[in-house]
Amino acid sequence: MRRKTEIYSVELNGTKDVKPADQRDDKKFKGAKNKDLEPNKSHEKEELKKELDLDDHRLSNTELEQKYGTNIIQGLSSVRATELLARDGPNTLTPPKQTPEIIKFLKQMVGGFSILLWIGAALCWIAFVIQYVNNSASLDNVYLGAILVLVVILTGIFAYYQEAKSTNIMASFSKMIPQQALVIRDAEKKVISAEQLVVGDVVEIKGGDQIPADIRLVFSQGCKVDNSSLTGESEPQARSTEFTHENPLETKNIGFYSTTCLEGTATGIVINTGDRTIIGRIASLASGVGSEKTPIAIEIEHFVHIVAGVAVSIDIIFFITAVCMKYYVLDAIIFLISIIVANVPEGLLATVTVTLSLTAKRMAKKNCLVKNLEAVETLGSTSIICSDKTGTLTQNRMTVAHLWFDNQIFVADTSENQTKQAFDQSSGTWASLSKIITLCNRAEFRPGQESVPIMKRTVVGDASETALLKFSEVILGDVMGIRKRNHKVAEIPFNSTNKFQLSIHETEDPNNKRFLVVMKGAPERILEKCSTIMINGQEQPLDKSSADSFHTAYMELGGLGERVLGFCHLYLPAEQFPQSYIFDVDSVNFPTSNFCFVGLLSMIDPPRSTVPDAVSKCRSAGIKVIMVTGDHPITAKAIAKSVGIISANNETVEDIAKRRNIAVEQVNKREAKAAVVTGMELKDMTPEQLDELLTNYQEIVFARTSPQQKLIIVEGCQRQDAIVAVTGDGVNDSPALKKADIGIAMGIAGSDAAKNAADMVLLDDNFASIVTGVEEGRLIFDNLKKTIAYTLTKNIAELCPFLIYIVAGLPLPIGTITILFIDLGTDIIPSIALAYEKAESDIMNRKPRHKKKDRLVNTQLAIYSYLHIGLMQALGGFLVYFTVYAQQGFWPTSLINLRVAWETDDINDLEDSYGQEWTRYQRKYLEWTGSTAFFVAIMIQQIADLIIRKTRRNSIFQQGLFRNKVIWVGIASQVIVALILSYGLGSVPALSFTMLRVQYWFVAVPHAILIWVYDEMRKLFIRLYPGSWWDKNMYY
């Protein structure tokens, strides 16, 4: 058994000793950012992926002072601070090494097919030099070499521009770093640059400040922090000096670098700076995690290897053949150039890029902003989605979900746009409860929002108070008016010790001048303060039966993963508390017991209304959705069930144990079809156990997980050969976003670091947008197959003329430059047009493609394109070629082995089949005519090829011949380019085109019709005999 995966077992500053700072070995810390501290990068990455192992949260203040050689009152001396700054370096994050832009550009110049074209260009210039030396130089090879270089440079620039994406992850982390810090040094308070902070410094923070380093709190007063970017917790977290948890990420006496203090004040000792802070470690981890190659990049690389392999193989075979047939080496080199150009689809990679760009634009309109174009298809290949809960699956706002009063549970409306609540509001108990909810609340709407819908108004207050305020406003209206009429005279804010909030109000009833005390807080604490309970508007003694009803409701609501609050009130006797009475909240000169319990209210961050349907679509599409959250397991499970990540009929081990009333250990784990796994459980798992979990359970929720555990979950999924999509919004998500096959950041709630690490940004933070992206991704894969099949088909029609030219010695049927006009002229727009083709069937009802089995270019596609349709096109081209020559007097048989005489400049009396003599110029003109006719023949047949590529299985009549209008724009572009080349540029000798007789345009039409009929028969038999030999070998 391998050792257990320690998730983030990090040594503080590289050492686990707790010596005073003065006694530690400074050599270990000098130049902490130098390479000599990174002898093994893979080892360092593994260290980064381990759980934080600190003990500072366990130490007393005295031990802390001793460990760091500091004093809570006086702080460090300036001299010592200078020494530590020189030793540890500034409190900043080290930027990663960047690949120079010129290197990125040069990679585009030699990637893909470019290297073959460079070879072709080099051979052109070599041929020219040889000809020049032999005094027979022709500028044709110079022109061709220049054109090939131009093609490489232009496609390289295009690819560089289109594929450039943000890799500056560290820069976004740096934006989060606080600029100034209030520090105590030499017994004086000083404002210094945060970069100058050192371990042992004593710093003070207040509401609104960013914490300038990892600190251990030694004083706190009402301090709350926002840790959401690090831990995923959406609720403000209280901070105190108490050691409350073994895990340093969850204890209350540690504050983390770059998190925000929301309210209160605190003083702390700096325990980590710069790269050694939690955010520093995450930044290093994100930068150190290598971006995985996207599936489409792997497919294109695979395709390039196939085409390059075919080109090189044919080159070698025919070079040897040419030499064996006594051709000059120079001629053999020229053959090589032609075969390279004929084999390489020069415009294809640019076409793929444009196709991906068009899809990316479509997705942007559907709120998916694609940063990395290849991610467009990756999303369609996704087989596992690891999704955050807060903000992605949920609405990212606390909302009132249930109420309990009069011994009944009422369901509240949790939809995004609440306009009213449907539960019974006629009871007197509800009147009292609604008053407490309204008055015992410090949240307020920002002014000037009267015309804004209530649920979209901006509120000053925390998440829970905001939910209660909006709930009250929807039902009662004019909450601020109610508060004015019930003036607040005293208040005890909520704190973690009391666990309640209390306020005292004058009442608006002119006949009742008693003060009203309202209280809300933890239900069990509120119940302790009550002696009566309100039922149907009447106070009754709080007996055992009522208490039991309370506990039943409390457990039921808590079991739904909702945050439950209790509410009670007390009218103060007018004779003891007259209108002139001065309330003192410090001495508490008023009653805090014998209240009347009114009811319970529970809140939750509810699911988005579109998510359940989106999850259902994922399941139909064979995609496993895994929830990974930092939230509580009960809450996570409740949301997972409500959105369908855990199906209604599927049980976890805990559910089975509860149903059978037995211990969890007694349940056979294989009986459960769903699993809820906590971060602590994951920490104790070996990689093999994680693999087993991911394999055996289709429905999984990971709760209370750390960011590093999220990365390990992603790696576990990838070990299953899954293509993994990960959503995230916080700094903590950056490593997992970068490691995933496709990282998806939140556009609204997402941090800069998350957006930079991701490949895609959801502009509306909505999980349903991912499913839309999956559909687009699957469609683009299908359409790319069609595009490649279309592009490859003509390669055989371009290659065969050179092979016949070499073997049979015919006059050259088509020139190299003419081929480039096909690849980069007539075929570009039609290739792109296929990106607009609609799906043939419901692509969301099939399983994700297997990244090793379902290839973009498979054997069936290559055989059908090359050997079926490709050979038909070649035959059609030769039919036109021989027709042109026959009409001019050269029968096909007379052309065999005529090449040498045909190309000899000194022969000006070459006889045709009728005895007519041809000069060298006349023969050259006829050669250009034959080449132009061959070009037109390929173009005509490519029109048929374009139409049949609209579908792979359905008849084009089922798909709709005119459904994709862009196809017809592509066809029109082919004809227009051919007309311009033939009739517009036909007089330019270097281009080898001539003005073609009208009848030659129609010679290849029967072949085009044959191609269409043949393909319709192929599709018919595939539909008639699914699963047959024909289906397996003829469907690509």
From Swiss-Prot:
It comes from Rattus norvegicus (Rat). The lineage of its organism: Eukaryota, Metazoa, Chordata, Craniata, Vertebrata. The modification Phosphoserine is found at residue 955. InterPro entries: ATPase_P-typ_cation-transptr_C (IPR006068), ATPase_P-typ_cation-transptr_N (IPR004014), ATPase_P-typ_cyto_dom_N (IPR023299), ATPase_P-typ_P_site (IPR018303), ATPase_P-typ_TM_dom_sf (IPR023298), ATPase_P-typ_transduc_dom_A_sf (IPR008250), Cation_transp_ATPase_P-type (IPR050510), HAD-like_sf (IPR036412). This is Potassium-transporting ATPase alpha chain 2. Keywords: ATP-binding, Cell membrane, Hydrogen ion transport, Ion transport, Magnesium, Membrane, Metal-binding, Nucleotide-binding, Phosphoprotein, Potassium, Potassium transport, Sodium, Sodium transport, Translocase, Transmembrane, Transmembrane helix, Transport. It comes from the Eukaryota. GO terms for biological process: intracellular potassium ion homeostasis; intracellular sodium ion homeostasis; potassium ion homeostasis; potassium ion import across plasma membrane; proton transmembrane transport; regulation of pH; response to metal ion; sodium ion export across plasma membrane. Belongs to the cation transport ATPase (P-type) (TC 3.A.3) family. Type IIC subfamily. It catalyses: K(+)(out) + ATP + H2O + H(+)(in) = K(+)(in) + ADP + phosphate + 2 H(+)(out); K(+)(out) + Na(+)(in) + ATP + H2O = K(+)(in) + Na(+)(out) + ADP + phosphate + H(+). The ATPase pump is composed of a catalytic alpha subunit and an auxiliary non-catalytic beta subunit. The alpha subunit pairs with the beta subunit of gastric H(+)/K(+) ATPase ATP4B or the beta subunit of Na(+)/K(+) ATPases ATP1B1 and ATP1B3; this interaction is required for the formation of a functionally active pump and its targeting at the plasma membrane. Up-regulated by K(+) ions in a dose-dependent way. Expressed at high levels in distal colon, coagulating and preputial glands; at much lower levels in proximal colon, kidney, uterus, brain, placenta and lung; and at trace levels in heart and forestomach. Expressed in distal colon epithelium (at protein level). Expressed in anterior prostate (at protein level). Residues 14-50 have a biased composition (Basic and acidic residues). One of its GO terms (cellular component) is plasma membrane. Its main location: membrane. Mg(2+) binds at residues 729, 733. The chain crosses the membrane at residues 100-120, 144-164, 301-320, 333-350, 785-804, 815-835, 856-878, 931-950, 965-983, 999-1019. Pfam families: Cation_ATPase, Cation_ATPase_C, Cation_ATPase_N, E1-E2_ATPase, Hydrolase. Coiled coil: none annotated. The active site is at residue 388. It is a multi-pass membrane protein.
